[in-house]
């Protein structure tokens, strides 16, 4: 299952939900305003 907003993400964790992406700096699922 994917993770929602403000959830931990990364190489060893589940992917973020649709419309979200993993922040490369803080390793959280964040909104992607460009998509």
Curated annotation (Swiss-Prot):
The keyword Secreted applies. GO terms for cellular component: extracellular region. Disulfide bonds join 2-17, 9-22, 16-29. SUPFAM superfamilies: omega toxin-like. Expressed by the venom gland. One of its GO terms (molecular function) is toxin activity. It comes from the Eukaryota. It is found in: Secreted. Keywords: Disulfide bond, Ion channel impairing toxin, Knottin, Secreted, Toxin. Belongs to the neurotoxin 10 (Hwtx-1) family. 49 (Jztx-F6) subfamily. The presence of a 'disulfide through disulfide knot' structurally defines this protein as a knottin. Probable ion channel inhibitor. This is Jingzhaotoxin F6-27.63.
């Amino acid at each position: 299952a994917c993770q929602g907003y403000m959830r931990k993400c990364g190489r060893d964790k589940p992917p973020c939900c649709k419309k979200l992406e993993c922040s490369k700096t803080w390793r959280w699922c964040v909104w992607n305003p460009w998509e």
